[in-house]
Amino acid sequence: MNENNDITLTLRELWGKANPLWERRYEDFITTHTDYSVGTSKYLDSRGKVFGAGYEIYIVAFFLGLYANRRKPMTKDTSKKRKFGQPVGYWGQIEARGLRQPYPRIQDYIFAALFAKTNVDLIALDKGEIPAAQVISQMKQTMEEYANFGFSYMTEKLEENPDYFFKEGAFLKLFLPFLETAEECVEGPESLD
């Protein structure tokens, strides 16, 4: 394994220990659609929720921001921020229940997207001029800002229509406007004629 792979592996492992923040103003939205803050003894009370753990809706919020290519800075007030109980390295590693299967590869997809979208000076990192912890902090900030846009976008939809998320496929339909934009961008090269 060459030195660059060692750096990437180390970054991946360090990033797995990160626990991204989210703004408290989205807590009602998160608890409405997830089992977040619901103990296992209350599992039956949480029927009808689309997502299990709170981080699952965070993943959706992150990908909304990523697909829209929009970031929204977090509030600087730390009292208005929260984090989920599990670091990213545990996301998607739930046990299989019924039709539900673990999905740990999501971590790899998120990491790859963050690595591509975060302005990291790999040469400075390789030379030891910047610590890996600084790179992880930058990647975590990128993730938080994409997710913050995603949460903002979802709550806007909720304000427009309070029943929006109680319709089949509502969370998937959130991505459609951004997918159409992406398809327009890859139509092909401009003619040189």
Annotate each language-model stretch with its function.
Residues 41-75:
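Short, basic amphipathic alpha-helical segments that act as recognition/interaction helices
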Residues 1-45, 71-193:
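Charged, low-complexity intrinsically disordered terminal regions and linker tails
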